[in-house]
From Swiss-Prot:
Pfam family, one: Opacity
Primary location recorded for the protein, binned into one broad class: membrane
GO molecular function: porin activity
Name of the protein in question: Opacity-related protein POPM3
CC per GO annotation: cell outer membrane
Localisation per UniProt entry: Cell outer membrane
Record-linked SUPFAM superfamilies: OMPA-like (SSF56925)
This protein's UniProt keywords: Cell outer membrane, Membrane, Transmembrane, Transmembrane beta strand
Family: Belongs to the opacity porin family.
SS bond list: none
Length: 170
């Protein structure tokens, strides 16, 4: 089955501070304003789309309602190359995501009739298998470093990224 072209992938990323000290140290010794930084990032991914709703007697949706709101969480590596201007930095980055699967099995039983010890049930079984892979993202970050006395240097930043998503329904 060909996946629809209109798939929206939104990701909220929280960078860990595990390896950010390497970038800070490189910029503090004033050898070069360029730096390379490795991060472990936490991603909370939500995949939605604009499939049509199955409304009306003659309109049926070809996509299960199960695939309308998929969520996943992952920890993945990210590498950045940036330039330090002194009080603020810019960086381009690449992140690689892990593959995750979504499988669902459901059974729905509805009693239709129960007369004279004769019971009629309607049983519906549904097996859905889908593989969604948020493969990678390319991003651009702008970071402002707060100047405080001491070793701890907080920062605030914003990141804009393009994410590549692949999915199939088995």
């Amino acid at each position: 089955i060909q996946p629809p072209k209109n798939l929206l992938f939104s990701s909220l990323l929280f960078s860990s501070l595990l390896f950010s000290s390497a970038a800070q140290a490189a910029s503090e010794d004033r050898r070069s304003p360029y730096y390379v930084q490795a991060d472990l990032a936490y991603a909370a991914e939500r995949i939605t789309h604009d499939y049509p709703q199955a409304t009306g007697a003659n309109n049926t949706s070809t996509v299960s309602d199960y695939f309308r709101n998929i969520r996943a969480h992952s920890i993945h590596p990210r590498v950045s190359v940036g330039y330090d201007f002194g009080g603020w930095r810019i960086a381009a980055d690449y992140a690689s995501y892990r593959k995750w699967n979504n499988n669902k099995y459901s059974v729905n039983t509805k009693e239709l009739e129960n007369k004279h010890n004769n019971k009629k049930d309607l049983k519906t079984e549904n097996q859905e298998n889908g593989t969604f892979h948020a493969a990678s993202s390319l991003g651009l970050s702008a970071i402002y470093d707060f100047k405080l006395k001491g070793k701890f240097k907080p920062y605030i930043g914003a990141r804009v990224a393009y994410g590549h998503v692949r999915h199939s329904i088995d």
